[in-house]
Amino acid sequence: MRIAAFNVENMFQRTKVFNQSDAQLAKRISLAAGELNLLFEKPRYSPADVRRMRTLLAQLGLDRAAQNRYALFRDIRGRLFRRTDAGLEFVATGRADWIGWVELRAEPVNAVAIQNTARVIRDASPDVIAVVEVENRHTLRQFSDRVLTQVGGSPYGHVMVIEGNDERGIDVGLMTRDDYPLRLMWSHVHEKTAAGSPLFSRDAPEYEVRTPEGRRIWVIPCHFKSKFGGDDAASRAKRAAQAARVAEIYRRLRDEGNEAVAVLGDLNDTPGSEPLRALLQDTDLQDISVHPLYDRAGLPGIGTFGRGADRDKIDYILLSPALFSGVRAAGVIPRGAWPGEGPKPRWEAYPEVKRLEHAASDHFLLWADIP
């Protein structure tokens, strides 16, 4: 059985600001939109809240119009403010007075990039694959049935995505072959932190997969809190809480007698990081990238995005001892990622990856052959 994990960075629609080259602009817009939506949820808006909303709306250019190139202000019922010649006049006193939000606009992913995503999955040919940053189940189904087959791949019989708490459409999904049915699913999307906010922005569901021989393998796809907005204390604490909870889920599965468990996906931190300690150091899960049979595919380290150096390791396939001990082969596929410009590319990419926008993803696919 071959298992894989791949952060595809969306199939058909990608947040528009993330498709341009200015990382600082993307960071500012993403953070401003996120902070605004949190402020909107307050039951009462203080004068300080209103001042901050005014500043953030101006940063997004939404003080002058309801939409622009990168952001959109949706006013569904009631009204947050009026636009006047003198500026914004706030009329809502709290969340109960209106319904609305700010969302980041999306645009179609480059058609060549979509096909390169399919080529990566075709070449890996996993029986079970965790797909990170996918829009929804329908999108993943269409990708499997339409795009994967266009490049000579085989469609997947079972496709599942559980919608998470992140409004950007970057959820985690699972695809399995016809003879690897999904028997049970357990979502953790409603779990809260001590402060009452969602613990998982993207769900960390449990799937029971049955093999053709009738064995049970539990698969937990993950996408932890990103460092994109800055690796601050709040970001680290969120990843630590997510890692600790997934470690609890893993221990429960093992205590229930399940020896075959895989935790996989984009954990958004490095192997020695403190936020991932509960999962990587405090359980008996083992990282496939340290297995002696792991094939780096010519990369300088075990990294899974960027340049492929050790410091670029943020994607994982973590296996329980029973699975890790039986690994027959494992590796990484960087061929769909942009190898850089110049006469000496960082790795051998597909001939179709001629420009940055042709890249399947910034991430590489991980795979392992397990018993």
Q: What is the role of each PLM region?
A:
Residues V8, V134, F224, D266-L267, ...:
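Active-site metal-binding loops of divalent metal-dependent hydrolases
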Residues M1-R2, A124-V128, S154-G157, G214-I217, ...:
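Loop/turn elements at helix/coil->beta-strand transitions in domains of secreted/extracellular proteins
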Residues N136-H138, E167-D171, K227-G229, N268-E274, ...:
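Active-site environment of divalent metal-dependent phosphoester hydrolases
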Residues R2, T15, H188-S201, E208, ...:
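Metal-dependent phosphoester-hydrolase catalytic domains
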Residues M1-Q150, M160-N165:
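N-terminal, active-site-proximal structural segment of metallo-dependent hydrolase catalytic domains
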Residues P212-R215, I220-R236:
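Active-site His/acidic residue clusters
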Residues A65-A66, L72, I76, V109, ...:
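Structured beta-strand-rich core segments of catalytic domains in phosphoester-bond hydrolases
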Residues V102-P108, S125-V131, V161, A194, ...:
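Second-shell loop/turn segments in exported
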